[in-house]
Amino acid sequence: MLEVNTYFDGTVKSIAFQTATLPATVGVMAKGEYTFGTDCKEIMTVVSGELIVQLPNQEEWQTFIDGQTFEVEANQSFNLKVPVETAYLCKYIR
């Protein structure tokens, strides 16, 4: 069953689903800055657009564009700058 999630007053929306192997969400972020927390390990892929990411315990920011992936371990938080509306796929490792 699909589940729609809305965050940050509607500027981030995702649809949760089950892949063949892992739970996942696919969503869109409006331009802005966000902080997300993880309950489990997350593998995030940019589908379209750009994410500028500050990973946990890192001072520098890294840019990810279409097709690029980054990972965040469980029980961490990470910061995002979204310069253009961006679509993403997030897989959850439980």
UniProtKB/Swiss-Prot annotation:
Query: What GO CC annotations are associated with the protein?
Result: cytosol
Which is an annotated GO molecular function term of this record?
uridine phosphorylase activity
Q: Please give the name of this protein.
A: Pyrimidine/purine nucleoside phosphorylase
Keyword flag Transferase: yes
Family that this chain belongs to: Belongs to the nucleoside phosphorylase PpnP family.
Annotated source species:
Saccharophagus degradans (strain 2-40 / ATCC 43961 / DSM 17024)
Query: Sorted alphabetically, which keywords does the UniProt record give?
Result: Glycosyltransferase, Transferase
Which reaction equation describes what this protein catalyses? a purine D-ribonucleoside + phosphate = a purine nucleobase + alpha-D-ribose 1-phosphate; adenosine + phosphate = alpha-D-ribose 1-phosphate + adenine; cytidine + phosphate = cytosine + alpha-D-ribose 1-phosphate; guanosine + phosphate = alpha-D-ribose 1-phosphate + guanine
Record lineage: Bacteria, Pseudomonadati, Pseudomonadota, Gammaproteobacteria, Cellvibrionales
Q: What is its EC number?
A: 2.4.2.1, 2.4.2.2
